Amino acid sequence: YYGELSHDALKPWTNANFRFFGGYQRDFYKADGGVVRSMPYWGARINQKVNNRLDLWAGYTQRNLGSTHSPYPFDEVEIPKELTYGGTVHLTDKDDVSLNIRQNAENGNIEYKNLTYHRDLHSFDAYFTYKAVQKTWEMKWTAKDF
């Protein structure tokens, strides 16, 4: 199960939004409760619309894991104390480019540095992402308006 508390965004200055959040997540990996992961977490996020073409953001999330992590590799928490920051440049009303960086706050390593081109295709969104740290490409198509 999962629960989160937050609030309406605070507006510290023009075109900026800031919010705190905190929550608790509990995952059961066996029907008899044999493997349980408890994870309280908290964080803060700020985003700023600089102008019509540029958005910036930054945030911090801390996941306080107990002694038991997920038994499944796809469900592991990679960065328990994580800084995220980046920005989006809106090239046209249908095209934008974003840089998103995820940094491990414990050791300072940049774990992800993703450059994404997004195109609005009316009923679909197309995303082409270059993951610079992993040196891989990812393409994603998302249906909308259905």
Predicted regions and their residues:
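Long, low-hydrophobicity, solvent-exposed regions enriched in small/turn-prone and acidic residues
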Residues: 1-146
